[in-house]
Amino acid sequence: MKIKINNKEYSFNKGDTVIQVADRNGIHIPRFCYHDKLSIAANCRMCLIEQVGINKPQPACSTPAQENQEYLTKSDLAISSQKNTMEFLLINHPLDCPVCDQGGMCELQDQALMHGRVKSRYAQEKRVVIDYNIGPLIKTNMTRCIHCTRCVRFGEEIAGIKEFGAIGRGEGLEIRTYLSAAINSPMSGNMIDICPVGALNASPSHMKGRTWELEEIKSVSAHDCIGSNINMHVFDNNVFRVVPRENEKINEIWISDRDRFSYEAIDHNDRIKKPIAKINGRHIEVEWDQAFEIIKEKLQNIDKKKSAGFISANSTVEEQYLFQKWLREIDINNIDYRVSQCNFENQDLEFYPQLDIPIREIENIKSLLLIDSNITYEQPILAYKIRKAFLKDAKINSISSYNYEYNFNTNNNLLVNPNSLSDTLIDIIEYLSHITSSDKKLKSFNIPEHVSKHFKGLTNKNIRDISNDLLGHNSLILLGSNLKNHPEFELLKVLVNIISILTKSNKGYLAENCNELGAWVTGCLPYKNEVISDSKNSGFNADDSIKAMLDCYIIYNLEFIDFYYNNELKNSLENAEFVLGIQSFVTEDDRSLYDVILPLATVFESPGTFINIENEWQNFEQGCTPHYMSKEGWKILTKLRLMHGKEISISHDYVDLLNEIDSIARKKKFSNSVQPHNIDIKKNLESFNLIRLGGVNTYYVDNIVRRAPSLNKVDSNKNIVRVNKNTLEKNNIDLTKNKVIVKQGDNKLLVELVIDENVSDNSIYIMNSNKEHFDLGKQYQQITIENV
């Protein structure tokens, strides 16, 4: 089909609007309300054009392209209409461009220059709009607002959380939150990007710099397993702000608030500025050479079989590769990145924690089963993809111990106690084994006896509905990242694998860190190096290394609260002969347990590579040179390898390091399936009267995010416990009081009580939002509650 624009013929597809055809062919049409990721509003009228044969101008954004029609974007009628619209928009717009954050990248400035009048005919006073506080992330200046409603539509359509709305009429119209509430969407910062004027600005960078002074540097998000592409805006060797970088395969044009504002942590008070060593019982700052000499001397006298190394799954591929390489060269095989995991049964069975399908294909799935995942806040970009699938009528179900609030609707929310999670999955397998027995392709798969012996012979309606939905074409099962703390994690992976076989579903584990696949590929595991699994030289896993009370511990880019057994770890470190930390940040309490701390550059100050959940290797650039006396991780680890006199093939050049890793690991293929016949079913989760639930707060997931001031102000009321009414009454809790005491072992905490029917029976939900919550005790363990 063909249309004419400005006397030239162009092809178009059915359903295209004129502005879409024009954009594809490089024809400029001004616009404010139109955005290709949002629905059409047609309320700014800036895109008015002439349709030949019609006397009135037409909005190009909402006018459907019609075959054999002719449109003019530069006729006298179109130009006059655009100038008139611009004049109306500028009537009330303040002339504060020199102090506006949007200055230099403002759509209104650009359009006014190209389509505005030279002189204004309006001489009256301009209106002024009150600025409401909508939270710590977005600074408003609503006098500049031109009512394009992009922010309103973003909340409704993309974030799935309707928080902004238009209140009033005419000149009194205001864009604001309902009841003057704060914005809580984990993707709210994207409204700053799509705002065409300076009405919505990033609070941390407000009034601190000009657009033309900034250098744009490509990078990758380091706070979830999606690997969103970002641009760092750098000025004077400081990250000034972070914005999305378009990548349609992964994050499209959006990023989470966690990715956008975490850069604030770079110069936090906990930042390690120089190497630190404990000398004569006191921690003092030393030079790099002195620190390396102390490390060399200490490691020479340590029993390597009684030493262990832990590295963050948020570290780069390069750091992970060099870390395990260095430790194995000095005969330390107790290496692990799985520090938040507590169940390591059958760990040497190959399990590559990747997604079976590309991220971009999630929006096309027909059915989804979420297992204990707070995905809206844990993985905001992935939740957006699922929301797109929901809007295409995908059937979504969840099984969890807490009914999380999603930005999409679900068919079934099956609420189960953590003790019953594996039993629920076995019930699904039992039902599926009956209804798939007539399928010739599935007949060859026999349910393992150690699974079938747990069949009960009864299934409820929710189990049947969830199972039937999965049997449809193109289904997906996702295991939430919080399950890594579950004592039956290995068993749950096996059961999910059986369900995926019976339903021909794709599956995936939502890793809690950005580079778990990198840690797996590079061999940061006790049973494999970067090339092969090697059970003969297998070392201790993280759990065993901590409980073994070893002589030496080396901790890379991890804080103690990142460990599942954090209290046990502290006890082991207190009794160790030597503890080395390679860290960007350290608290005063943690500092006392280290003998040497080397200052590590943050992810913003170092180049590197992350492997996301779909096995996409993504390189990123160094945003700024390391602050203070910190160094890039790959340089520190290369120095440590050279210091021990090993013959190494790697040079000091970063490119050579990339080539070495690429030749060894990049082309290897791995499986994320766990063979169900190899694992026995064991109930590792004890039956407690009360069991503790709760993942990690989305703004407390790693050592950078938890130090970003603005992010930590988002949810000010963090010290709360959630329990349902039935559980409270069974434990004789006074429902008229708003404070209770919770206890785990010898630790106790005074918290605010919230009665919440979304919590499963005999469970207490405490989100880990501060150090006190981590120190209280572990998830999925016994907890008690009592009156104050």
Model-derived features: positions:
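N-terminal export/assembly segments and adjacent metallocofactor-ligating motifs
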Residues: 1-23, 31, 35, 50-54, ...
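A cross-kingdom feature strongest in bacterial/archaeal respiratory oxidoreductases
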Residues: 34, 324, 364-367, 376-405, ...
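Acidic/polar loop patches that form or flank catalytic/metal-binding clefts of enzymes
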Residues: 200-206, 239-241, 305, 309, ...
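Long hydrophobic segments that form regular secondary structure
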Residues: 236-253, 258-268, 272-277, 287, ...
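Short, structured coil segments at secondary-structure junctions
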Residues: 330-331, 392, 408-410, 495, ...
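Short, charged, surface-exposed secondary-structure boundary motifs
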Residues: 344-348, 407-409, 423-429, 519, ...
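Phosphate/pyrophosphate-binding active-site segments
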Residues: 411-413, 422-483
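A glycine-rich, hydrophobic/aromatic-adjacent loop/helix-cap motif
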Residues: 474-546, 693
